[in-house]
Amino acid sequence: MLAVDGIMSENEENRNPLPSDEEAGPIRNAAAAPSKDGEEPSAGSGPPDPDPTGEQLLHLRGAIDEIDNRLLELINRRLELVVEVGRLKADAGRQVLDSARESAIFNRLIERNRGPLNERVLRHLFTQIMAASRQLQSPQRVTFLGPEATFTHLAAMNHFGQSVEYVPQPSIQDVFTEVEKGTCHYGVVPVENSIEGAVNHTLDLFFESELKICAERYQAISHDLLAKEGSLRDIRTVYSHPQAFAQCRKWLQKYLPGATLVESRSTAHAARKAAEEAGAAAVASSEAAHIYDLTVVASRIEDTARNTTRFLVIGRDEIHRTGEDKTSLMFVTSHIPGALYRVLQPIAESGLNMVKLESRPTKHQNWSYFFFVDVEGHIEDTAVADTVERMAGLSLYLKILGSYPKAGDR
């Protein structure tokens, strides 16, 4: 819109005609006439000098246009090469999404970047280019915990870009199911929040599913209070997801102590309810305000500014090592004293860095638990492979959930 507005204003200036002699009246005639004593008019009363700023702008804009033209040519040339890569992948039976390759590209570009382009914008630009590249190789369908404007939807778009087909699902279970059936190539699900901890439903589903973790993404979470009207006085009911309520508990108690809090299955569903009901509001993202035509009554109402959710991309792909990877495991131990310690001991002895440990009931036997572990490194690394092999020998059950590039934007 800014570029369009700029073009419109320049065109409007070009359409304004110069005043006629009659319109200029005595000003123009006085400038052209000699003085009474016969002297020529002074330089200050003649035609204005050319605008040096305008000439410089024209020169700079011309240079920018040339660069834009070259960028367009280079991007199209890149996409032509991508099509050739896609043909080779298809012939070899390889998947379109190559998280290791994309991670290596990002790392290389970030290392080469000398500014003024910042890393966040660089990632955004090349995310869109890579999304267009994947779409040319093979149209991609990505499913997520919906509806539109959930934080999972935002995380999916930030990871995959705009050039894929997004398919919302009403539950995390449905996301797993659609990928398992093959109707969608990948799914995006939340797995943990920096404030509220693990998303247990996601962890539980990995126990039964054969899907792999193909990538991870950290998404900053910021909550807004949305309503049809922009006044706190009129709000009697607030809808939101339980985790969003928990993350905004202090603000809601302070500013809406008398409001009824009603849990919804997602923040986006809460926004939809607020749009349909008088006197209702929702705790949701600013993106939801645009989609459901709501007003942002208050922004950034979360109790803690450093609120981040980790999302996982699930699919069937085995991701190759990048050198900056993470491996996720799940295992079940025997129900005897010291069993967990013995299974984890190989990690300590190998010098690997364990970055997550979580437990969940197996639901197949009372007081039986499975454990989730994340370690730095890739299963193709000798140290990781040897450690996992030792852990498997000490467990009743062990499964590798996937090795994938570590996300850089925490």
Question: Where do the protein language model's features map onto the residues?
Answer:
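Domain-level signature for soluble enzymes in the chorismate/prephenate branch of the shikimate pathway
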Residues: 2-410
